[in-house]
């Protein structure tokens, strides 16, 4: 091996060893609201201006921005800092809340993979580094707020992708139940885009009780393993990847019972892992999410096309279609 090749391999090894630094630094910038500050300012800002607006001292802010500029997150010209097309995706209205959720102690400490967890099938998410139950940790309250904000941001982005790239999904549909809707962000955005649709946000009673009102959306509390409100269509957005195959089949059967046999459909909005070598720009992201599921959810996973077909067949659906909405998720429409 020549010296240059060896040096390159060493550099790659160091990049892997320190790979956690980039998302950590980006999370710090989001926590300081740097993307929002630059976006709202409407133009480049000096270090002094950015320091005053963020409340972060100049020296550490300079070092943080230097790192993120090197990695292409922000831009700098004539000693002024500015947004890039990438950094705009980390504002509060985009993926900023998701970055903050990943930075909470409850998420960051336990979600790393370990050999022990892979051998035993034990979810690291339910244990802190001290071996205690993370859900009872005082930090969990903050984590749940961050989690809700992250899911809201994700729902907003995914609903926008559906509206933009697959509006035909709601042709002839008069009512839609969003199962596991939390505070109704996704169904609210869809009803706003397709005002003839009556939206039903369905989640556990204690969750919908805290939901703000949304025009065109009714909030219903219940348990998806017992029954699902009836509608022309049932939507499962980022729900089934949390559950085992058996539980998914149970959920899908309950959804099938809720729709008309002649015109109804179940819309699954979730990732599809590609194993055939032909992927798209989100293929790596989906594999990363599967690693998170491997560490976080003992039974959950991101599924391949064959695995989705198996679930649909076992749940009694006769046919299905798949639509690429140019997002991390696809829309799988299953028919009785």
Swiss-Prot record:
- For this UniProt record, give its keywords in alphabetical order, as a comma-separated list: Methyltransferase, S-adenosyl-L-methionine, Transferase
Query: Part of which pathway?
Result: Flavonoid metabolism
Q: Give an example GO molecular function.
A: protein dimerization activity
Instruction: Indicate the impact reported for residue 181 to G.
Output: Increased ability to use cirsimaritin (CIRM) as substrate and to produce scutellarein-6-methyl ether (SCU6Me) from scutellarein (SCU), acquired ability to synthesize pectolinarigenin (PECTOLI) from SCU, but slightly reduced efficiency toward scutellarein-7-methyl ether (SCU7Me)
Q: What is its EC number?
A: 2.1.1.-
Q: What does the record list as coiled-coil region(s)? A: none
Tissue-level expression reads: Expressed in leaves.
Q: How is its activity regulated?
A: Substrate inhibition by genkwanin (GENK) at concentrations above 10 mM.
Protein role: Flavonoid 4'-O-methyltransferase involved in the biosynthesis of polymethoxylated flavonoids natural products such as nevadensin and salvigenin, aroma compounds which contribute to the flavor of sweet basil, and exhibit pharmacological activities such as anti-allergic, anti-oxidant, antibacterial, anti-proliferative, and anti-inflammatory effects.
To which protein family does this belong? Belongs to the class I-like SAM-binding methyltransferase superfamily. Cation-independent O-methyltransferase family.
Q: What is this protein called?
A: Flavonoid 4'-O-methyltransferase 5
Give the taxonomic lineage as stored in the record.
Eukaryota, Viridiplantae, Streptophyta, Embryophyta, Tracheophyta
């Amino acid at each position: 091996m020549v010296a240059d090749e060896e040096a390159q391999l060493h550099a790659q090894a160091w990049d892997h060893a320190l790979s956690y630094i980039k998302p950590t630094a980006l999370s710090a910038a989001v926590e300081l609201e740097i993307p929002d500050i630059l976006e709202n300012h409407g133009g480049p800002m000096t270090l002094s201006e950015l320091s005053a607006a963020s409340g972060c001292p100049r020296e550490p802010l300079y070092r943080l921005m230097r790192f993120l500029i090197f990695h292409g997150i922000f831009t700098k010209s004539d000693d002024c800092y500015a947004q890039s097309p990438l950094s705009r995706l980390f504002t509060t209205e985009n993926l900023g809340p998701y970055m903050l959720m990943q930075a909470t102690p409850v998420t960051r400490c336990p979600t790393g993979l370990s050999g022990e967890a892979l051998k035993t099938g034990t979810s690291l998410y339910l244990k802190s580094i001290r071996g205690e139950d993370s859900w009872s940790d005082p930090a969990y309250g903050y984590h749940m707020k961050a989690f809700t904000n992250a899911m809201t941001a994700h729902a907003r982005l995914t609903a926008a992708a559906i509206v933009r790239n697959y509006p035909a999904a709601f042709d002839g549909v008069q009512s839609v139940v969003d199962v596991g809707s939390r505070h109704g962000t996704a169904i609210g955005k869809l009803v706003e885009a397709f005002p003839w649709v009556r939206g039903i946000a369905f989640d556990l009673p204690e969750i919908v009780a805290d939901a703000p009102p949304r025009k065109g959306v009714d909030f219903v509390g219940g348990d998806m393993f017992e029954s699902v409100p009836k509608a022309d269509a049932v939507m499962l957005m980022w729900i089934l990847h949390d559950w085992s195959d058996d539980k998914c089949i149970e959920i899908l059967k309950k959804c099938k019972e809720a729709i008309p046999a002649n015109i109804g459909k179940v819309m699954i909005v979730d990732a599809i892992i590609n194993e055939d070598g032909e992927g798209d720009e989100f293929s790596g992201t989906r594999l990363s999410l599967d690693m998170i599921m491997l560490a976080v959810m003992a039974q959950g996973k991101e599924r391949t096309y064959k695995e989705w077909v198996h679930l649909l067949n076992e749940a009694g659906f006769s046919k299905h279609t798949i639509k690429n909405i140019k997002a991390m998720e696809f829309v799988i429409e299953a028919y009785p």
